[in-house]
């Protein structure tokens, strides 16, 4: 805890309000609310926390707070601050998404659309549907049944949909405003669950076509009837009152929250939505924050009713959704069972997440244990892997990645610029890097890896063994990963003498080695590109008197490219602390080089 934070903690009031945690760059990284600012903010800097909260606290360099009149006011302010600043540690709706709706436009000739924007434009909106697939499925069925206008053709022209019976060309078919209004009412009834009239009409048309021996058209109507029936089956009726409502349940475990929402429209459960995220405050307060992020977004259509769990403050939810929505905390009966069902589903979803995570960990752990057995060595908990990268010997580099318990530990990655080798000599380059890496391990008493994997065959393995055994007197197992002619991981070499370790291509052990080889190759190539770009940049600045390495570095850091420098003014370059004479000489040289 720095001195600034310590001083500010002493000044915190006991009022309700919002607090904004900032990092060392002044960026807002977390927004929270509290009934008592003093107790809540101080809690971050006292006692122990779980891993995710410790990560948050480790990045806090400063904080601000805003006092409010009430906890509800703090809740509303928190939502607005989160939406405005999008702090990285705050919960967000998945992919920042809004939900799709089916819309009937308010036009002379109405159209059916799918939209994620709910506007006050006179259109009719039905939904929400938690994904575009569900909305598209229903719209396709509507398109087949109701011949709405689908094109932007002039009134005196017909379109493709007219020829397949899915669009009434309004002028040619002499349709009236009453006709279109009737069509709108039919769709409203259909989407509101009153589809018996439509089914009866389809059955009558099917019989009529059959009587006329038009069996293909009759089959089309039969398929439409079956499609409506299938849709009915998917939309489970959970209430007979035909009301629109959202039913919420949530569950917390291991510092994570899962919120489950049942979307009920016209008494039918049309879809559900699941969101999982880490929480940092009280579970009830973060649940309210989640609801606020959803319902304060103007793109989201509110239902007539909302059911919430019994431990959630009803007054706060009512403040979030407004007077037009009724909020209930059911205590018994069928409504209570629906909230319990949403809560149960939230628990199942979160439990499944942890089960899958544990299975993944167990699978990876099993892979490294089996790898050790196949190689005849102790389980390689820590694996260090090396790869070289250069183009015809220019800008040669090497890179090391570290996998611990089968997972990459990027904090332990290392980059090496080759210092003692000239020209394209991979073996000499690797000899230098192995020497530098493990001399430091030995000198500083660092924990050596359980296994070293070279991105290469026998030559690379032998070089590493020679340095470790004969120069450093270290006994660390070294293996090599050879690639085939398609540059794909092919086989593992290990032993003394080297032999191919038999690994099935579909085994977890092979997949682990494949990931390691891909990662070290990616890391080495990325580093090489950075060095090559920097060297190219620096070489173009050579020959300017007064422009040494430090000033070149400043130019690279601030302008990023030669083009940006060429477009800069003398004053822009002077602002970096470079004398006017040197700045002018630099721009003159770049101007000459470009001609």
UniProtKB/Swiss-Prot annotation:
Gene that encodes the chain: uvrC
UniProt-recorded name of the protein: UvrABC system protein C
PANTHER family referenced in this protein's UniProt entry, alphabetically: UVRABC SYSTEM PROTEIN C (PTHR30562:SF1), UVRC/OXIDOREDUCTASE (PTHR30562)
Annotated HAMAP family: UvrC
Subcellular location: Cytoplasm
Superkingdom per UniProt: Bacteria
Protein family per UniProt: Belongs to the UvrC family.
UniProt cross-references to InterPro entries, sorted A to Z: GIY-YIG_endonuc, GIY-YIG_endonuc_sf, GIY-YIG_UvrC_Cho, RuvA_2-like, UVR_dom, UVR_dom_sf, UvrABC_protein_C, UvrC
Biological processes per GO annotation: nucleotide-excision repair; SOS response
Keyword Cytoplasm: yes
A Pfam family assignment: HHH_5
Every UVR domain range: 196-231
Gene3D superfamilies with a match to the protein in the record: 5' to 3' exonuclease, C-terminal subdomain (1.10.150.20), GIY-YIG endonuclease (3.40.1440.10), UVR domain (4.10.860.10), UvrC, RNAse H endonuclease domain (3.30.420.340)
Molecular function via GO: DNA binding; excinuclease ABC activity
PROSITE patterns per UniProt: GIY_YIG, UVR, UVRC
This protein's UniProt keywords: Cytoplasm, DNA damage, DNA excision, DNA repair, Excision nuclease, SOS response
């Amino acid at each position: 805890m720095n001195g600034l934070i310590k001083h500010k903690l002493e000044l915190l009031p006991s009022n309700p309000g919002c607090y904004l945690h900032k990092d060392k760059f002044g960026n807002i990284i977390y927004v929270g609310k509290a009934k008592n600012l003093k107790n809540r903010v101080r809690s971050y800097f006292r006692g122990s926390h779980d891993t995710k909260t410790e990560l948050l606290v480790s990045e806090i360099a400063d904080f601000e707070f805003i006092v409010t009149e009430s906890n509800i006011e703090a809740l509303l302010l928190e939502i607005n601050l989160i939406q405005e600043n999008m702090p990285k540690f705050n919960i967000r709706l998945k992919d920042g998404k809004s939900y799709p709706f089916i819309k009937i436009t308010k036009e002379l000739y109405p159209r059916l659309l799918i939209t994620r924007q709910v506007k006050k434009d006179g259109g009719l909106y039905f939904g929400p549907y938690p994904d575009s697939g569900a909305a598209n499925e229903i719209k396709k069925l509507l398109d087949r049944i109701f011949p709405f206008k689908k094109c932007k053709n002039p009134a005196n022209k017909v379109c493709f949909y007219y020829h397949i019976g899915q669009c009434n060309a309004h002028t040619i078919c002499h349709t009236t405003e009453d006709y279109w209004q009737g069509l709108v009412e039919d769709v409203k009834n259909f989407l509101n669950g009153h589809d018996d009239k439509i089914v009866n009409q389809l059955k009558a048309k099917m019989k009529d076509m059959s009587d006329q021996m038009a069996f293909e058209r009759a089959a089309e109507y039969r398929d439409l009837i079956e499609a409506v029936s299938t849709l009915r089956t998917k939309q489970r009726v959970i209430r007979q009152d035909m009301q629109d409502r959202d039913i919420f349940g949530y569950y917390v475990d291991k510092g994570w929250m899962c919120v489950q929402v049942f979307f009920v429209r016209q008494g039918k459960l049309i879809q559900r939505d699941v969101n999982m995220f880490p929480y940092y405050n009280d579970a009830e307060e973060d649940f309210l924050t989640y609801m606020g992020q959803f319902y304060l977004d103007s793109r989201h259509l509110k239902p007539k009713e909302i059911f919430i769990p019994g431990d959630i403050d009803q007054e706060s939810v009512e403040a979030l959704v407004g007077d037009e929505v009724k909020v209930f905390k059911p205590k018994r009966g069928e409504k209570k069972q629906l909230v319990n069902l949403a809560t149960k589903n939230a628990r199942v979803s979160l439990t499944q997440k942890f089960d899958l995570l544990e299975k993944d960990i167990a699978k990876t752990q099993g892979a490294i244990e089996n790898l050790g057995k196949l190689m005849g060595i102790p389980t390689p908990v820590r694996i260090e892997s090396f790869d070289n990268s250069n183009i015809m010997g220019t800008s040669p580099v090497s890179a090391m990645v570290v996998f611990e318990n089968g997972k990459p530990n990027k904090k332990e990655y290392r980059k090496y610029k080759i210092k003692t080798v000239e020209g394209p000599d991979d073996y000499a380059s690797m000899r230098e890097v192995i020497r530098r890496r493990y001399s430091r391990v030995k000198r500083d008493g660092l924990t050596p890896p359980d296994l070293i994997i070279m991105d290469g065959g026998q030559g690379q393995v032998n070089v590493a063994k020679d340095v470790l055994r004969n120069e450093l007197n270290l006994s660390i197992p070294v293996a090599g990963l050879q690639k085939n002619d398609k540059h794909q991981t092919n086989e593992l070499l290990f032993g003394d003498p080297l032999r191919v370790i038999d690994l099935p291509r579909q085994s977890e052990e092979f997949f682990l080695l494949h990931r390691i080889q891909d990662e070290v190759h990616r890391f080495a190539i990325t580093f090489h590109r950075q060095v090559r770009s920097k060297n190219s940049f620096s070489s173009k600045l050579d020959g300017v008197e007064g422009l040494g390495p430090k000033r070149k570095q400043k130019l690279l850091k601030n302008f990023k490219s030669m083009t940006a420098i060429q477009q800069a003014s003398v004053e822009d370059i002077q602002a970096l602390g470079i004398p006017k004479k040197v700045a002018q000489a630099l721009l003159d040289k770049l101007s000459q080089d470009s001609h």
